[in-house]
């Protein structure tokens, strides 16, 4: 079994490609199950956010796994494989695990150290686990990765001033206007990204914020939390006419702000307007950027305007990368030890069989034993067996991660009289349990 990651992100694909390759939240479970039915795919988790679509999979062979991951992607999004392929990246084994650690800790994000991705990775894993597309390897890997990322954000300063892409959006507004005092802001959308934007706007001197959402009750909840106003969705044009800054982040699959309508609106508007589109797919038609005084930024534009990270943060990143290397080695040592689990179980079962034979012999030779005495003897005998096996099992685990591990394990089986049949029975039971 091998760990293989395939995906595209803000490093490899522009937004006009990424927005076509986003898994809808309502279709996540179906996508996971469909992928699991592909040849070579044994486990899978799909991570789909505004900046990345990545599949982490366990495959039986790297070469066939790569092909079937690409085929699934092309079929799911109804695109030619040749059109998608130039934007895809693949990471195998240690490189794949290393990449997942960096992604989850926010080291691969548009905004270094952002925390939102941790929740997104955790959610992706939980959905896959509930759907039944994860197994021994990915369950272990994602638990370790999430735990590590939590420690990173708790014990380092990597996430200072870096909450999410929403943070970058607010920084753009500050760079353009300097002070945001007395600016009128309209937020379109009442989801997580809008909430994060409001958190970043807090303390910026803005007193006039209007939230517009198709479902008005969601806007009202957010407005109450941040002392903002609620605008009617059907009156969006009126609110845009008065706005200085507009942040747009909805789950709409088609643009809700269109070039023709904005051209007419801007002809009536006396001042310029900054529009930051952090939706994916994009919520604002790209042609709006050609309208005079209509300053449009999308997610990719944000990368070029966020200030460079300080030397201190770069130092922390270097330290984290070194720590991640240690975590990756630890994971693969654990994986190697998985290979000796059937041997350990076979050894324990052989010892328990010997105990059972001995207890039966005792019962026949000492018919006067009470039930309590018989049980106590059995407990003590089991304790002796466990103590005697503790050191050999520990040594076996150590052997499994050393050079010539296969030869050492074969010697171990010969010493304890374990046959290939003994081990094969356990391996078959494990395979049936996983399936």
From Swiss-Prot:
Substrates-to-products reaction catalysed: (S)-4-amino-5-oxopentanoate + tRNA(Glu) + NADP(+) = L-glutamyl-tRNA(Glu) + NADPH + H(+)
Pathway(s) per entry: Porphyrin-containing compound metabolism; protoporphyrin-IX biosynthesis; 5-aminolevulinate from L-glutamyl-tRNA(Glu): step 1/2
Catalytic residues of the enzyme: 50
EC number: 1.2.1.70
UniProt GO molecular function: glutamyl-tRNA reductase activity; NADP binding
Keywords from the UniProt entry: NADP, Oxidoreductase, Porphyrin biosynthesis
Swiss-Prot/TrEMBL GO biological process terms: protoporphyrinogen IX biosynthetic process
CDD domains: NAD_bind_Glutamyl_tRNA_reduct
List of residues binding NADP(+): 189-194
Swiss-Prot/TrEMBL site (Important for activity) positions: 99
HAMAP family according to UniProt: Glu_tRNA_reductase
NCBIfam families reported for this sequence: hemA (TIGR01035)
Domain comment, as recorded: Possesses an unusual extended V-shaped dimeric structure with each monomer consisting of three distinct domains arranged along a curved 'spinal' alpha-helix. The N-terminal catalytic domain specifically recognizes the glutamate moiety of the substrate. The second domain is the NADPH-binding domain, and the third C-terminal domain is responsible for dimerization.
Physiological role: Catalyzes the NADPH-dependent reduction of glutamyl-tRNA(Glu) to glutamate 1-semialdehyde (GSA).
PANTHER family: GLUTAMYL-TRNA REDUCTASE 1, CHLOROPLASTIC
Protein's recorded name: Glutamyl-tRNA reductase
Gene: hemA
């Amino acid at each position: 079994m091998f760990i293989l990651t395939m995906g595209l992100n803000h490093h490899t694909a522009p937004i006009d490609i990424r927005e076509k390759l986003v898994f809808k939240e309502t279709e996540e479970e179906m996508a996971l199950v469909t992928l699991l039915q592909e040849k070579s795919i044994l486990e899978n988790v799909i991570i789909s956010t505004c900046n990345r679509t990545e599949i982490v999979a366990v495959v039986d062979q790297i070469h066939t796994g790569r092909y079937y991951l690409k085929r699934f992607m092309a079929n799911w999004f109804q695109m030619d494989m040749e059109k998608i392929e130039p934007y895809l990246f693949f990471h195998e084994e240690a490189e794949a695990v290393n990449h997942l650690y960096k992604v989850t800790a926010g080291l691969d994000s548009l905004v270094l150290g952002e925390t939102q991705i941790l929740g997104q990775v955790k959610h992706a894993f939980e959905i896959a686990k509930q759907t039944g597309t994860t197994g021994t390897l990915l369950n272990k890997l994602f638990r370790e990765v999430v735990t590590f990322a939590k420690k990173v954000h708790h014990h380092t300063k990597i996430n200072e001033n870096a909450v999410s892409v929403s943070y970058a959006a607010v920084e753009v507004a500050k760079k353009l206007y300097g002070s945001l005092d007395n600016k009128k802001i309209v937020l379109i959308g009442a989801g997580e990204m809008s909430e994060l934007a409001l958190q970043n706007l807090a303390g910026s001197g803005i007193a006039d914020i209007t939230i517009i959402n198709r479902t008005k009750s969601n806007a009202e909840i957010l407005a109450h939390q941040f002392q903002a106003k609620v605008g009617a969705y059907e009156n969006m044009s009126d609110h845009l006419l008065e706005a200085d800054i507009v942040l747009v982040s909805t789950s709409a699959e088609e643009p809700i702000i269109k070039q023709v309508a904005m051209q007419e609106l801007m002809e009536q508007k006396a001042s310029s307007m900054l529009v930051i589109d952090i939706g994916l797919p994009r919520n604002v038609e790209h042609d709006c950027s050609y309208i005079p005084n209509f300053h449009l930024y999308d997610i990719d534009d944000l990368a070029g305007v966020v200030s460079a990270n300080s030397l201190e943060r770069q130092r922390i990143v270097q330290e984290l990368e070194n720590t991640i290397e240690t975590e990756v080695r630890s994971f693969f040592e654990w994986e190697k030890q998985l290979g000796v689990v059937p041997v350990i179980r076979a050894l324990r079962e052989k010892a328990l069989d010997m105990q059972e034979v001995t207890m039966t012999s005792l019962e026949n030779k000492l018919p006067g034993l009470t039930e309590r005495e018989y049980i106590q003897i059995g407990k003590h005998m089991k304790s002796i067996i466990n103590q005697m096996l503790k050191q050999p099992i520990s040594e076996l685990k150590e052997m499994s991660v050393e050079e010539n591990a296969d030869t050492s394990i074969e010697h171990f089986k010969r010493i304890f009289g374990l046959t290939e049949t003994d081990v094969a029975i356990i391996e078959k039971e494990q395979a049936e349990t996983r399936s």
